[in-house]
Curated annotation (Swiss-Prot):
GTP binds at residues 19-26, 87-91, 141-144. Increases the formation of ribosomal termination complexes and stimulates activities of RF-1 and RF-2. It binds guanine nucleotides and has strong preference for UGA stop codons. It may interact directly with the ribosome. The stimulation of RF-1 and RF-2 is significantly reduced by GTP and GDP, but not by GMP. This is Peptide chain release factor 3. GO terms for biological process: regulation of translational termination. GO terms for cellular component: cytosol. Belongs to the TRAFAC class translation factor GTPase superfamily. Classic translation factor GTPase family. PrfC subfamily. SUPFAM superfamilies: EF-G C-terminal domain-like, P-loop containing nucleoside triphosphate hydrolases, Translation proteins. The gene is prfC. GO terms for molecular function: GTP binding; GTPase activity; translation release factor activity, codon nonspecific; translation release factor activity, codon specific.
């Protein structure tokens, strides 16, 4: 790989933003895009009446409900780095899509609501990041409102998440009393409300301001200095190595809504966040600077533009250089393909991509060739990256088309939404009626909404009273083993499994059939 290309790859910073719903994830995403010069003003998800919707929320149901249910991909340049942001679903039901997204990034930014602290969804996503060993940067948001005390938030972060923390800055007051941020890294105080030339006040060797200033009269100024002294003496030592290893999280305080502390966070993040690294494959570790092009499909999205009825496969480039029109191999099928139609996104705005390098995320127009987890490369025709995990659904519904004359629309919609991973599909053993499985209730709502809006198919869904899926070997697939509490079905790959009513039904099945092995996904 040439030095120029190595430099280009090193400039990539690809990360996901994770949080609990309503922690301010979409707002901070928009402020980052503002600093990247991509948008002129940040729209707010909550201001529905203004008609301004969040840049990253493009699907109709997201605009209506103010939640992210798909993962958007956004790119911009900042201070010599090419930033790729993946805005993950902020709703607890969408763990599958989020998990796949986290497989495609090199670091994560965790947004926490200062009033609520660590919430269930944040903890779940954090564990996935820890499992992958990627660096986690923490932004404690909503400091313009009254919330938990900063020291309490730090203690919660360390106790609940089990990770070292190092505050990069420290709030001087909060809510109506918020006066500024004491920036330990850049050795300045950033004022909350000030003229531009007075926004950053330099600190002296003693840790106090070099020159006297009105901010020192703030009720919380002396308290902040005392807390900083405590952190210096009793807190964790700053360690770039531990940050990169995912063992220490740098913590930033701020307010995304008032755009306070966000640019300082971005500037520091760009300094610390890792560039694209290696990926495990069946042929060993593939380094980002490997000259051969390779990547994997982590997401498929149909109807991003309803007018065009298109379908996009999102690929994370793992190594080498992509050039539009290049020939590659889809290793699952061994099929040779020409990548002529490639695109990059800013929510629902798109532009053609002529070249991209390791770390970049691009969209490929898909006519049905790709599946989630596919590897494509112009190197070894047998190369395959690690499989993306699939979750075991916990809710199941039988699904029918209301209008039997529109079966074609119905089947096309189900097939496409299953292929993009929006829902999982099962079929009854003999009659092959459709049963759909989801991790959470909202997935069914999104499925119904998209079937109606994108495929013109009104559907009816009925609960089947089963909650647990367990796969069996083909030789053990006997319909006579089905009971009122268990049901033999097949998945989209025709693999047999039983759907059980509850744990009691599984235990009963195991007692009656000790030789049959039941297996689960994640």
């Amino acid at each position: 790989m040439s030095q120029d290309l190595q430099k280009e790859v090193a400039s990539r910073k690809t990360f996901a933003i994770i949080s609990h719903p309503d922690a301010g994830k979409t707002t901070i995403t928009e402020q980052l895009l503002l600093f990247g010069g991509v948008i002129r003003s940040a729209g707010t998800v909550k201001g529905k009446k203004s008609g301004k919707f969040a840049t990253s929320d493009w699907m109709e149901i997201e605009k209506q409900r103010g939640i992210s249910v798909t993962s958007s991909v956004m790119q911009f340049d900042y201070n010599g780095s090419r930033i790729n942001i993946l805005d993950t679903p902020g709703h607890s039901d969408f763990s599958e899509d989020t998990y796949r997204t986290l497989m495609a990034v090199d670091s994560a930014v965790m947004v926490i609501d200062a009033a609520k602290g660590i919430e269930a969804q944040t903890l779940k996503l954090f564990k996935v990041c820890r499992m992958r060993g990627i660096p986690i940067f923490t932004f404690i948001n909503k400091m313009d409102r009254q919330g938990k005390m900063p020291l309490e938030l730090l203690a919660e972060l360390e106790e609940v998440l089990g990770i070292e923390s190092y505050p990069m800055n420290w709030p001087i007051g909060m809510g109506k009393e918020l006066a500024g941020l004491y920036d330990r890294y850049h050795r300045v105080i950033e004022q909350y409300r000030s003229e531009e030339d007075e926004r950053f006040l330099p600190l002296g060797e003693d840790g106090d301001l070099k020159e006297a200033h009105a901010i020192q009269k703030s009720l919380y100024y002396d308290q902040a200095l005392e807390e900083i002294m405590l952190l210096d003496e009793a807190g964790n030592d700053f360690s770039r190595e531990r940050i990169i290893a995912g063992e220490q999280t740098p913590v930033f305080f701020g307010s995304a809504l008032t755009n306070f502390g966000v640019e300082t966070f971005l500037r520091t993040f760009v300094d610390f966040a890792p560039s694209p690294s290696s990926h495990e494959s069946n042929e060993g570790v593939i380094e980002a600077d490997n000259p051969k092009f390779s990547g994997f499909i982590f997401k498929i999205q149909a109807n991003m533009n309803p007018a065009h009825r298109d379908r996009i496969a999102f690929i994370r480039i793992c190594s080498g250089e992509f050039e539009r029109g290049m020939n590659v191999t889809l290793t699952r099928t061994g099929k040779s393909m020409k990548l002529a139609n490639s695109t990059q996104f800013m929510a629902d705005d798109r532009e053609t991509v002529n070249r991209a390098v390791a770390g970049d995320i691009i969209g490929l127009y898909d006519t049905g060739n790709y599946q989630i987890g596919d590897t494509i490369t112009n190197g070894s025709k047998k190369l395959e990256f690690e499989k993306l995990p699939q979750f075991t659904p916990e809710l199941f519904m039988r699904v029918y088309a209301k209008n039997v004359m529109k079966q074609k629309h119905f089947h096309k919609g189900v097939e496409q939404l299953v292929q993009e991973g929006a829902i999982q599909l099962f079929k009854t053993w003999r009659t092959e009626e459709y049963i759909i499985g989801a991790v959470g209730q909202l997935q069914f709502e999104v499925f119904e909404h998209r079937m109606r809006g994108e495929y013109n198919s009104e559907i009816r869904m009925e609960p089947i009273g089963k909650k647990i899926a367990r796969w069996v070997k083909e030789e053990d697939a006997d319909e006579k083993l089905s009971t009122a509490r268990s049901m033999l079905v097949k998945d989209r790959f025709d693999q047999p499994l039983f759907l059980f009513e509850n744990e009691f039904a599984i235990n009963w099945f195991n007692d009656k059939n000790p030789d049959i092995e039941l297996t689960s996904l994640l």
